[in-house]
Amino acid sequence: MVGVPHAQADSNRDPKVRAQNVSDAFSVPDVADAEHPVAHTDSEELIATGADSALVDAAQARDEAARLAPLRLMAVHAHPDDESSKGAATLAKYSADGVGVVVVSCTGGERGDVLNKKLTIDSAEIPALRIREMARAAEILGVAHVWLGFHDTGYHEGPPESWDLPAGSFGVLDPEVEIEALVRVVRQYRPHVMTTYDESGGYPHPDHIRCHVVSVGAFEAAGDPDAYPDAGPPWQPLKLYYNVGFSRSRITAINEAVREQTGEGPYDEWIKRFSDQARPDPGTRITSQVAVADYFHVRDAALRAHETQIDPDSTWFAVPRDLEAQVWGTEDYELARSLVDTTLPEDDLFAGVREKVSS
């Protein structure tokens, strides 16, 4: 296993040397372009944007720790900020427990709007800002982070058949190219457990739907020596989970608990949208619930780090966390694939994995 060298020698204070150290950690194709990007770590992006050396060192240290830990978890998301709104407390908990955690962002979120009304930002600034925001969120969660390198497709209204997706974006490229890119990262970090979205993407965003396709494809191909032989030595993850963050049962339970205290339900409009949707409630598919109430404050801090993407006065933060902990103190998942024996329901994503790894 090749780790990212942590900057210790004097020569590593040179940004060019440190950037080469990061690049050397990946087995990458000889040619990179918009349709065949090279995955890169937070530290490489921070160097490119002129970030303080302490931030770079911290990112490299988290990356090395994620590779060397005896148990390893990879969370695959569509955009920066998704990791902080979907399963963030789980990532923080496992990181605090000594699990090596790496987040993979399939795109850079370049087409995201500025959702914080307090900010006035030119659209040209968004890509660099989102790099910094993601680095801060990763530091708060205690996780490593990898950019898969594809371009954001942007959100599109209406049914999928009406979408006019931009050329060269994540949602329209050949999925095989994207799967190979993620297989390369899986084989580098060797996770025992992976998390991503279900086939609906969690909500109808083309990048979220494609993230599901790519994540499942990589889980199934990474351990096959005949699949993508140039993407590094094979490694087979043992379990794949889908995030179930916004089940109707969870949102309704929290909403009614707040209403009992205040007379108002912060999620009333959200619940109405649920009733208008044709797709089934993902909550009916929950198999695994991880107790993470002690890390809700970490989750919130990580989400606030994405300041262009979240209004600090939004309903995301309208629920008292002690009340949320009492009503629904877990983050929820659907076990989609398992190559180890386990008993459902679970309270640990590593159920069955710990025994296999230690044997």
Give each language-model segment a name.
Residues V2-A9, R13-P29, S43-A51, L55-Q60, ...:
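C-terminal accessory domains and tails appended to enzymatic cores
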Residues V101, H192, W235-K239:
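Residue-level recognition of the N-termini of beta-strands and the immediately preceding loop/turn
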Residues E83, E110-D113, E199-P206, R248-R250:
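Active-site environment of divalent metal-dependent phosphoester hydrolases
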Residues D81, T107, M134, H145, ...:
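Divalent metal-coordination and catalytic microenvironments
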